């Protein structure tokens, strides 16, 4: 990650409106990963990541920041919900499976990168195998000179036709590696055992091939994947993945507030306090056994988030609070924020609906006053009922464009015709009554 914090925030601004404090904290944390890697090894070991706790109501951008961060980081990243895990010893997934999933994500990420590097070599090798199937080598008698030049010219001619797609529908018989896959279902918490069994069965059938009759375009795709797999060194890949997980891994734990013990409840809850105590060594730094080997979690960055509607950050066990030193509070959205969300981000909601309906030949245009009125209604409904943040806009837009979406095929008009205008009057006529009537908005919006 060589992007500066300012560049990271600028990139996040393309997709997320407001929440500057959260963006800055995440950008600094990401940049610190890069800074740490520039240090001498002795000091590098001592510098641990400063984990983040994001606090804010639902629908204000906590999860979206995580999603966008994953794409920016180009590092092993996994997003999990804290509610999916139970205390060790009980039925369900234990928190160590987070690191195992992170290891899987690292292998997938690095394999894709390696395959891109060897893509051209794999394509050449795949073409040769397809040409061998199309043009079997001529049999040559003893002491006879093979007509190499003729063969070569014919092969080049076929290679040209293959690349131009002229042979795509021709059927050939070709040897393909036999896929050995065994689906094993197991109870939650036993994923490691199923992975080991699947690896065992896969290794038993490794190297077996079978002859298949396929169209050239399908065979080319399969053979290309096969050749790319051969060119990637699995042992080297595992070593790189292990380093990537330990040095650059990022874990985003959502819904952390749901495992916080509420102030007025007594006793110990298996799904709450036990999960927090299991998370402690993971965040502090421990060693977890994965398919890559033993993974140390000391330098993995953990970002936790929660709405904390029914509990407070202080309801988390004190040790966990201490392991999440950076606190960032995300603010509730205002009508102006809703207005910006509808129009400013890259691939905004209004742009998505406009492009979707354009596929039917129907043009719609969102007027500024229509967007403003829609934002006001979203804010009003959130205030009167449950505040679900920007997710309310999805509900309102679906309701607003329901009739247009349903009749789009019938309404499609000539390309020169004027578009359907979504202005304040249109919004009021479709949503005004529902927004004003609290009982209706509670059930419909």
From Swiss-Prot:
Name of encoding gene: hslU
A GO cellular component annotation in the UniProt record: HslUV protease complex
Pfam family, any one: AAA_2
The protein, known as: ATP-dependent protease ATPase subunit HslU
Subcellular location: Cytoplasm
Molecular-function GO term, any one: proteasome-activating activity
Primary role: ATPase subunit of a proteasome-like degradation complex; this subunit has chaperone activity. The binding of ATP and its subsequent hydrolysis by HslU are essential for unfolding of protein substrates subsequently hydrolyzed by HslV. HslU recognizes the N-terminal part of its protein substrates and unfolds these before they are guided to HslV for hydrolysis.
Keyword Chaperone included in the entry's annotation: yes
Listed SMART domains: AAA (SM00382), ClpB_D2-small (SM01086)
GO terms of biological process kind: protein unfolding; proteolysis involved in protein catabolic process
């Amino acid at each position: 990650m060589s992007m500066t914090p300012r560049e990271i925030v600028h990139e996040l601004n393309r997709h997320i409106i407001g929440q500057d404090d959260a963006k800055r904290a995440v950008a600094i944390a990401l940049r610190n990963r890069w800074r740490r890697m520039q240090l001498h090894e002795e000091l590098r070991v001592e510098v641990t990541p400063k984990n983040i706790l994001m606090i804010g109501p639902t629908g204000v951008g906590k999860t979206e920041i995580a999603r966008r961060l994953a794409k920016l980081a180009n590092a092993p990243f996994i997003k999990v919900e804290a509610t999916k895990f139970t205390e060790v010893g009980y039925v369900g997934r234990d928190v160590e499976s987070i690191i195992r999933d992170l290891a899987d994500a690292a292998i997938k990420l690095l394999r894709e990168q390696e395959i891109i590097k060897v893509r051209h070599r794999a394509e050449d090798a795949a073409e040769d195998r397809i040409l061998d199937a199309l043009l079997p080598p001529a049999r040559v008698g003893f002491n006879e000179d093979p007509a190499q030049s003729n063969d070569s010219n014919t092969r080049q001619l076929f290679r040209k036709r293959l690349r131009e797609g002229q042979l795509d529908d021709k059927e050939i018989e070709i040897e393909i590696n036999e896929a050995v896959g065994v689906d094993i279902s197991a109870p939650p918490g036993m994923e490691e055992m199923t992975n080991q069994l699947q690896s065992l069965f896969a290794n038993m059938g490794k190297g077996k091939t079978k002859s298949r009759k396929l169209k050239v375009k399908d065979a080319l795709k399969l053979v290309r994947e096969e050749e790319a797999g051969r060119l990637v060194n699995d042992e080297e890949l595992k070593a790189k993945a292990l380093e990537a997980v330990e040095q650059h891994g990022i874990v985003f734990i959502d819904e952390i507030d749901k495992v916080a013990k509420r102030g007025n409840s007594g006793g110990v809850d298996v799904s709450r306090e036990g999960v927090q105590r299991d998370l402690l060594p993971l965040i502090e730094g421990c060693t977890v056994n994965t398919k890559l080997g033993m993974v140390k979690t000391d330098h993995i960055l953990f970002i936790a988030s929660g709405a904390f509607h029914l509990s407070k950050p202080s309801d988390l066990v004190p040790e966990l609070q201490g392991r999440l030193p950076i606190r960032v509070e995300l603010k509730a959205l205002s009508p102006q924020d809703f207005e910006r969300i509808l129009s400013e981000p890259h691939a905004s909601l209004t742009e998505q609906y406009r492009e979707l309906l354009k596929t039917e030949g129907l043009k719609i245009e969102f007027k500024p006053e229509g967007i403003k009125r829609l934002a006001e209604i979203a804010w009003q409904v959130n205030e009167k009922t449950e505040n679900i943040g920007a997710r309310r806009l999805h509900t309102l837009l679906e309701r607003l464009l329901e009739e247009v979406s349903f009749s789009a095929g019938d309404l499609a008009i000539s390309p020169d015709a004027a578009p359907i205008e979504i202005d304040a009057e249109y919004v009021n006529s479709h949503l005004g009554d529902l927004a004003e009537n609290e009982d209706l908005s509670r059930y419909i919006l």
